[in-house]
Design a protein with these regions (language model features):
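A cross-family phosphate/adenosyl-ligand binding-site feature
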Residues: 1-72, 76-144
Length: 144
C-alpha cells in the first residue's frame, strides 16, 4: 500500500546520504478498490483513479540527503525535467527519452542528461546502461 511505502521511506531517510528515486511507484491508484471479485457481467468496466501520494516530494522535504529524481519524457524533456526538479525540491534530475532510438526501455543502452538545482547540465552520451549508471553515480558524488 502506498501509505506504508511512504512511512517506510520516511523512517529510513535520515540514515542516508544519497537517494536515487529511479521510478514512481505509481502515479495513480484506484479511487475506490473493490473488496470483492468484480464479475464479468457488463460489456465494459469503468474504474476511477486518483493521484497516488508523491513519495519523492514527501521525502525531499524531510531529509538532508541528496535527492536524485528521474524524468522519462517524450516531448519538452528539458523543460519538463527542470520543472519536476523544482516542484519536487530535488537536487538533481536525470532526463531520458522514451521515444529515442537505443535508449529508454527494452534496450541495453541509454542516453541521459543530468540537471542540478544549481543550473549545471551534464550529458551522458549513448552507452550501456551499466556504464551510464556508474557515470551517473560518479558525477553526483563528485559534484555535491
Amino acid at each position: 500500500d502506498m501509505e506504508d511505502a511512504l512511512n517506510s521511506y520516511i523512517n529510513s531517510i535520515n540514515k542516508i546520504d544519497y537517494l536515487f528515486m529511479v521510478a514512481a511507484v505509481s502515479d495513480y491508484v484506484i479511487k475506490e478498490p473493490s473488496i470483492n471479485k468484480i464479475k464479468r457481467n457488463k460489456e465494459s468496466l469503468d474504474i476511477e483513479f486518483t493521484h497516488a501520494p508523491d513519495l519523492i516530494k514527501a521525502i525531499s522535504s524531510r531529509t538532508d540527503a541528496t535527492i536524485i529524481g528521474f524524468a522519462l519524457e517524450t516531448e519538452n524533456g528539458e523543460y519538463n525535467a527542470k520543472q519536476k526538479m523544482k516542484d519536487k525540491d530535488l537536487d538533481y534530475i536525470v532526463l531520458n527519452y522514451a521515444n529515442e532510438d537505443n535508449a529508454g526501455f527494452e534496450t541495453n543502452t541509454n542516453h541521459v542528461i543530468i540537471f542540478s538545482k544549481d543550473g549545471a547540465k551534464k550529458e551522458l552520451t549513448l552507452d550501456r546502461k551499466d556504464r551510464i549508471s556508474a557515470k551517473l553515480i560518479n558525477y553526483i558524488i563528485n559534484n555535491k
